[in-house]
Amino acid sequence: MTLHAYPLNAAPAVAVTGLSRAYGRRLVIKDLDLVIGRGEFVALLGESGCGKTTLLRALAGLDAIQGGRIDAPRRPAVVFQEHRLLPWETLWRNVSLGLPGANIRERCAAALTEVGLGNRLDDWPRNLSGGQAQRVALARALVQEPELLLLDEPFASLDALTRIRMHALVKQLVARHRPGVLLVTHDVDEAIALADRILVMRDGAIAFEHRAARSDDPAATRQGLLGELGVETDLETV
């Protein structure tokens, strides 16, 4: 993996050039280019096995790549589908993991307050609902003030109402902190609700791009994206 650091405030959140990744003889990502700007929210759709999570893991520095280049200011923050909280640590201690500098508890308290859990600093993960645990995971990511936030289907295991609440919270937090965001998801409606730009990945490459606009018809956008994913719908019956 080739990783080149930009000076802060002088570059996009991440720039990928000619990225390739293979498992054995199977090429999972093929000469992929991608730029995500500061404050831009990008959603990545695609069938299982198309390379979405492999791309996210490469951007996070969790997987090596065989070719290409990733330019980023510093290590990004990641929120996974599972919250990955340590059950033997309190909430604020979970948020503090890997956090450098002074005033750690105060900064963690502020982050937990942002996600609506400021009164539960010394509580334990076992006492949280699924949505609350994911809010702690978001606080843990954003307390780092990352230039790039990677979201790997973080709402997939939540019920419908909790997902809607989490969408609103994420939009609010991203607007406040202004990281570049890459959301990997299978949910077309989630992508439409959250993203400034929606990408469809197919066979290890970006096959389609949609840039959100105020004039967009959500139903038509949904139908177009489903078509790109190989799901044909009749707009009149949706």
Give the residues covered by each predicted segment.
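Helix-to-loop junction immediately C-terminal to a conserved catalytic motif
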Residues: A60
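Hydrophobic anchor residue at the start of the ABC signature
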Residues: L138
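The feature captures the beta-strand-to-loop junction immediately N-terminal to the Walker
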Residues: L45-E47
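Conserved beta-strand-loop-alpha-helix hinge in the C-terminal portion
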Residues: G204-G227
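A short, proline-enriched helix->beta-strand linker immediately N-terminal to the Walker B motif
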Residues: V143-E147
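Conserved ABC ATPase signature
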Residues: W124-L128, Q132
